[in-house]
Amino acid sequence: MPEPIGWPDDPNSQPPLPSSSLMVEDGLELLAPIEGDARELFVTVDENRKYLREWLPWLDDVNSVDDELAMIRRIRDDKNFNWIYLIRVYGELVGVVSLNWVDWDNRSFGLGYWVSESSSGRGIITKSCRRVIEHCFVDLKLHRLVIEVAADNHPSRAVAERLGLRLEGISKDREWLYDRFTDSVMFAITAPEWNVQSGAN
């Protein structure tokens, strides 16, 4: 597990670690990966490789169970709180929600996500992201969320919009995606804004 990092206003304090499990609703749970999940995670990625490759730049780095095992170990030992949750629907692994980065100095974090092709369009990602965001704002006391996606990745953009994030900007040629540059868009929301929005729903 990563070691806690002190809050900026009190270097001796320790923020809480992300929970190892988050219940979303009946049958939908988020679990931090363990080494025993490596094979199932690789199979899920491999079966959806063509589908995911359209917008995710890391597929060529995942070619074996050992690659996934190394990733799980790296996250476990990461001191900067890179963190992922496996999305399980009645036990079946269907995707991932990840804390791609956490900036403890400014109490902000970035969120990423993907879901298998057969599980897309069912609201699974939106519900899962909402649960992780609540955990980060309420339990981890973070202040600002950023989601950055490819400008033409309309399903991922729709997730950010459904979650109530605002569009803050467009970056030209932000990412090299296998054979081309792609623009990205950045969405964001702060904890106070999230609380107002949640209270209204």
Predicted regions and their residues:
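Conserved GNAT-fold acetyl-CoA-binding loop/helix
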Residues: 53-73
